Amino acid sequence: MKRFLVGGIVCVLLMLPFLSSCVISKTGGEDGFHYPAPALLPGTTSAMNTPGFWIGIHPDPDRVVIPAEDLEAFNRTIRKETGVIQDPSSFPETFQGSRISGAAQGSLRFISSRNYFRQDGTRADAEFFSGIQEQMNLSAIPEEVPVRLALVTSYTHQRILPTDEELYSSMKSTDLDRLQNSAYDIGTPLAVFHATRDGRWLYTITPLSEGWIKAEHVGYCTREQMVHYLNAEPFVVTTGSKTDLFLDQGLRRHHAYARMGCRFPSRDTGSPGVIEALLPFRNEEGKCVLKGAFVMAGQVSRGYLPYTPRTIILQAF
């Protein structure tokens, strides 16, 4: 009898983890192990979820941390001394072809050595990369490559290789596309050096990176046009995470959106709450033409925002 009692207790103890998981699953996620995050963390209040709370406890929220002229000088120093940020409008008339072909070939060589997965779960094999290399047509790059300047006319992705197909390090991390290099908003300046065999992709250098961008997303311009557009005044700067751009003053014909920090030449519309921004468009010949688009006044700043604690807090929220 004692032996049966001990055995019963052992069985109950062994079953407790499984029984507890059944109870947990009623309040947890579908698998019983994931829980919704609490609305408030310990030691916090709901007021802390508003910018006003933090502005209210700051001793001097409207103090200018760095004046605008000092910020401009700082930016010039960054561009000049680090070389991290490039200015396509100041590029020479030509680049050495080996510089462009070497960079493009190096990217292909690196990616093809990583054993990445394709979207269908198969490995990206030699046949896959052979097709891409054929499209890259790097042998057509001359010794001296003419620099063609352009502006981005549609929000676009810059790819490490000229393809829309995504590659993953594993099928458990499909949220990270290993071929995505960057993304650029309307109005971004860039230089074009080469096109794929089918003409759909362009090898480009932007202020921050280089890679392949779809040809249909850029409009070619002269150096003078680029400099004028980038420095035109008055201008507005987008302040929302995504600022909607419309083709009509009534804000009904949606064109695109621009992320925070985009600068566009502007002019008043005469209508309260609406501002006209000048955007680059691509015409049938592939050239850049400037046309007006319209934004809500509350989603942009006339000129750059002042560098104050209030500004930083508001933008963070």
Model-derived features: positions:
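Secondary-structure boundary elements
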Residues: 315-317
